[in-house]
């Protein structure tokens, strides 16, 4: 069979089906849209499920795709086998009421024979037990009856993807790899056929004839229209066409393995291959998942990604790597896959950053965690026990970040077993209180507690910042207790409190509970119904139910929260005035440092709109508007025109916050008494959290002052560096220097005190002017320096003699190779002409790099052309190493490409080609 690269196979596939009238649909996200039964996209047909069931109008009747997929059901065997992967790509062609069984079979065989160039006598097929129709179609196309195998529901009835959706009988294509692949049992066994577990027959394409829709309950209902769903694993097909025994030996995965060899210093062999394969596979899953916005987390998809990162880190450790490592593969992965998935180019830097941070987080505790696990196993050995308890496993999880499955894998490698059920029980206990965070936990996980009327907390925080409070209930480690002691983390329920509990987007208050000899730091405040939960750490002394404490919030933090909450209301009003009444709040976060506001709007905000919104809010802030609070019946509140959240549940009586004609909203949060208290308002970021919605991040008050102080300090540092470079190069700042003054911190403080509502707009404009000037002058300085360097390069008489001394001597001529950074092609040609004039029998192989690009210039005299040297031919072969393009004549050729780091190696390769001709 003819060798074909993975990229070539994918291209052949999409071109073929496009010619057959299929719409080529881009791969969907790894997050399945509108399908709660799936954690990840696991097959090509997932994005087409609504089309098969008739749930949506058809945009086309036939489609094809190359779909990225993640499956982790066989995670523990990845790395141990030749073909298991968690990430793979699926080729698929689909019909929605258009063609059916006959055409699907014809397409599959035609593509296999005439495009993949698989010999017909090597193809076997399987069909569902009673599918005589499929058998006839295969035989009509020349597949003999003896190479058609009937299999049951387990093998030849497919679907659905998830718990529901389209499904039906299928027919699969197999490649006969020869009796030698059957091993000692099946080698020459005439009964060995597709369906056998040996490696002789490998399935490479599954044709599903969708006739049914399976409901969530498992019932099979006839589809409104029949359909075709085919799937062919891209890596599997490449393995067969490249005639290797493992998907990890195919061209793309082999490139990743080679990069791991370079980074680790280890060779890929029998002793290291499991580690190499795990890292190769998991890095792909993580790379594509992060690219689709699936970030490491404690639950759901994020937990799976975190588990893959940590599993790969453990296997990297077996190669002697004890530092963040996976993120270093991102560049290689980007180069490999950005042709099929161009969106990854722009995401690569973010992926690299997130991955590095996650690796650092895990490696920080890994060493200690492994030592702790070793202690546990040694203890079990002494006690002659074989089971690691769920409690121990959970301790490794909560303290050292070991995913349950990773601990299980580690202990089973050592011959122990793991108590899964016990781990689950410990996890349930921890749902409320965890070592890492108090935030967002639910009251029902506190043993022996219910939010009863007797535990109602009276909230005083709208008017008070401190109060005398009686302790109604205590919790430590999730359990109800009557007293606590120093050093314990606890949850305290009080009869009355000034602490605001998280709600309406505003985060909970922090502060202290004190009495003589006792101090409790409140790190967060949550609530369940009318019960307020003060969560934190006992810093000093003991506390018992019934004790009276002084409750006091952090007043400055509360003021900052009020600034940002009132600022959020003004922002909402400004958005509706400037963008239109279609703007609806979709969510918000109000913290002491910033606010985040999600709202409905179909497109990104322009620069002018952002300035308008910012100005509108700052005008309201400067207008000194009193903030009015009313408690109204809900009907009355709605009639007053107050805005409310559509999906929020309200009681019969609601609190309404008004700021003149600028804002009127339902709200239970804490606010300023006058808009002037907000100080200043600045938008720092605008983006999209999802289709049809926009997100603004903004800051208020002192945060705005600190923001601009930092912005201008950073800008001043950049300008200082630029001016220093200009002066060092040209002796003065006349042409390239930036002389406009950057406001000092003292001047900025004065501006904030004097300029009021206009200060943010003025500072934004000034910053932009300085940034534009810096960019323009930096570009001009760079070009001038480059021009000077090239002039010096051209005028250097010692360069020619130095290169001639370094030349490689061969029987029929000499060759000089050199890489010059930041030199233009014309200068290289001039240099080559000088060398040729001084030494007629010399071949010049020059390269230069600039940023992410590279250029090659090859030149010689005609005397070497007569001896077999053709610069154009040598260049063409060499540019493959740089993903480049170019060409030329026998005596002169020029080309460019990427991969500047590979230029030196490419010249070595060119030298080896020249050596053959000149020896």
From Swiss-Prot:
InterPro entries on file: aa-tRNA-synth_II/BPL/LPL, Ala-tRNA-lgiase_IIc, Ala-tRNA-ligase_IIc_anticod-bd, Ala-tRNA-synth_IIc_core, Ala-tRNA-synth_IIc_N, Ala-tRNA_ligase, Ala_tRNA_ligase_euk/bac, DHHA1_dom
Catalytic activity: tRNA(Ala) + L-alanine + ATP = L-alanyl-tRNA(Ala) + AMP + diphosphate
GO MF term list: alanine-tRNA ligase activity; aminoacyl-tRNA deacylase activity; ATP binding; tRNA binding; zinc ion binding
Top enzyme category: ligase
Cofactor note: Binds 1 zinc ion per subunit.
Keywords linked to the UniProt accession: Aminoacyl-tRNA synthetase, ATP-binding, Cytoplasm, Ligase, Metal-binding, Nucleotide-binding, Protein biosynthesis, RNA-binding, tRNA-binding, Zinc
Pfam families: DHHA1, tRNA-synt_2c, tRNA_SAD
Subcellular location, record wording: Cytoplasm
Gene Ontology BP terms: alanyl-tRNA aminoacylation
Annotated positions binding Zn(2+): 565, 569, 667, 671
GO cellular component: cytosol
Function, in words: Catalyzes the attachment of alanine to tRNA(Ala) in a two-step reaction: alanine is first activated by ATP to form Ala-AMP and then transferred to the acceptor end of tRNA(Ala). Also edits incorrectly charged Ser-tRNA(Ala) and Gly-tRNA(Ala) via its editing domain.
Domain remark text: Consists of three domains; the N-terminal catalytic domain, the editing domain and the C-terminal C-Ala domain. The editing domain removes incorrectly charged amino acids, while the C-Ala domain, along with tRNA(Ala), serves as a bridge to cooperatively bring together the editing and aminoacylation centers thus stimulating deacylation of misacylated tRNAs.
Descriptive protein name: Alanine--tRNA ligase
Organism: Leptospira biflexa serovar Patoc (strain Patoc 1 / ATCC 23582 / Paris)
